[in-house]
């Protein structure tokens, strides 16, 4: 599942749920037994790399064609018109990624390896090891800082995924603030899940308010 949003006609944002992007190795600190080669799900290296290939192709396909570059001089051969007018998204928010290893494989060992994405991610206390991440184009977003916002658990509840916050300088020298979150699922029904989702929304609102308190025209 994904959506694409164009901001100010020059930045492209995409959100993509990776739907359990786990590697094939066991993390002794996490409950990732479902996603191992010997598990009932049979999460083999072949299935893992096929998933990475599909995700990378999806991200590339969600880019856009910059018609302003078509027919201009190619940097490799000034006498030849450029045909390289396809731009991948400037930002890709990813949900349900396990660790830095899978992000390295996605950005450096898949169809995205020539795209030059950098990334930041959370390290949440989620029992399964599920996190969120942000891929970004360094040419569009010069990272200033990133951090995880820990969700304060409600009484008698399990830890959930952190919110990822990142700020950076964009092309017009403004500072852009980005939040990536994956709210608790509605498993168990709307009434059961609503308090958890409201807790996440409340902490997100608090973080946004703190930015606006310092700059009421901040770009978020």
Report residues per predicted region.
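Classical Sec-dependent N-terminal signal peptides that target proteins to the secretory pathway
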Residues: 1-4
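N-terminal, active-site-proximal structural segment of metallo-dependent hydrolase catalytic domains
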Residues: 6-112, 120-124, 130, 201-202
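Residue-level recognition of the N-termini of beta-strands and the immediately preceding loop/turn
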Residues: 11, 87-90, 117, 176, ...
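A short local loop/turn or secondary-structure capping micro-motif enriched for an aromatic residue
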Residues: 22-23, 152-154, 185-188
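Short C-terminal domain-edge/linker segments immediately following a structured domain
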Residues: 42-50, 123-126, 149-154, 208-213
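Structured beta-strand-rich core segments of catalytic domains in phosphoester-bond hydrolases
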Residues: 96-177, 183
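Extracytoplasmic, non-cytosolic globular domains
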Residues: 164-220
